[in-house]
Amino acid sequence: MVVNIKDIAHYGRWFPFYKRDYDLWWFDKEKCQMIDAEKMGITFDCDVHSLHNVISQCDGNYVACFRVDIPALEMEYARIYLSKEEADYLFKLPPKDMDREFQRIIEQEALVGRWYRYELARLSVAAEQWCKDNHIPYKV
């Protein structure tokens, strides 16, 4: 089976300010699909915090999803497409507030579509590299 990069790209969205100590998504190489951590915990009869330890003892069929730091990506985008004043303003905010303000600014500036295309492109690159690193057949 071959995974379509566009089908998995959005699973890599990661917000470090939520401070989770576990992966939200896992890829089942056999079924060629993403599975959320809660379902994985049920499958392996463990809590989500123990998944890495439990799965590391398996046959390598499950792979933790890639992560793209979305607030960092938003700042990268802001430095390229927003005014210097807006980017400087965002940079001074705590990450959670910055994310909210970034969304407000791109909506106000009518840049939402451009942002989502930019984000998808970066997520797709990360997904493709993750597939290569984990020997997962893919198509773009």
Give the residues covered by each predicted segment.
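Extended, charge-biased low-complexity segments
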Residues: 1-57
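Generic surface-pattern signal
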Residues: 10-20, 56, 83, 95, ...
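Short, well-structured alpha-helical interface segments that form or flank functional binding sites
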Residues: 22, 60, 122, 126
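A structural signal for short, well-ordered beta-strand segments and their strand-loop junctions
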Residues: 26-27, 64-65, 139-140
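Aromatic-anchored, charged helix-turn/loop surface patch used as a conserved interaction hotspot
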Residues: 33-90
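Amphipathic protein-protein interaction modules
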Residues: 65-123
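Acidic, proline/glycine-rich low-complexity IDRs
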Residues: 114-140
